[in-house]
């Protein structure tokens, strides 16, 4: 496969996606409006490669070869040479619609436009372009270099060729692709977020402390991480956004975001990335 990848967004997910593309030997350009965010993301990628060297997973030559495949740009026009564009911006419907309109204008005629959305309709995103058959969902899991799954979501108009190419790319990245239908939250977050939301309700109602809730789920249910620690890792703002998509899209009160989650997000307590969520970092 001779793909050239462009990743839109240099945040937690964007830099992780760029990392695995570079590690697989695929040329990748990470694009963000902020030069500062790009510098920070590149430093994170370098640090993660160094950590892999210390663990004996790769050697210095492999790291250097991977980093030679990575470039950065503040110009969205850099997507013009990409065969696959992977959007990894904030989980905001209107923002993604705007980005896909721009990508459709700037990307090459046959380029696949993929989105890392964790909950938003692929069909609706595709409708903002003139190439709906080339739009697809590639939902990576966090942290991207570690997690093996990619949810693949085809929209109503996504072609078989686009699906096949995306599945092949996922495998080339060393991931396991699993196809999900285009419903709010797909599979992963339709199952995960109600559990996280219920854990937040437990804290709000005084059923248990965050530590108690997480310990019960780790030791009692054999989860590697408790739901509240996981929410902090995902980002409480992202959790809230996904729950709102589920609640609006499926119309069931069981997806109603817990008021305490809304309060934390309003306070700027977003989890690890802000230094405080259900835990202090």
Task: For each feature predicted by the language model, list its residue ranges.
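NAD(P)-dependent Rossmann-like dehydrogenase/reductase catalytic/cofactor-binding core
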Residues: 24, 161-164, 171-182, 201-205, ...
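Amphipathic alpha-helical segments at domain termini/boundaries
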Residues: 25, 66-84, 165, 169-174, ...
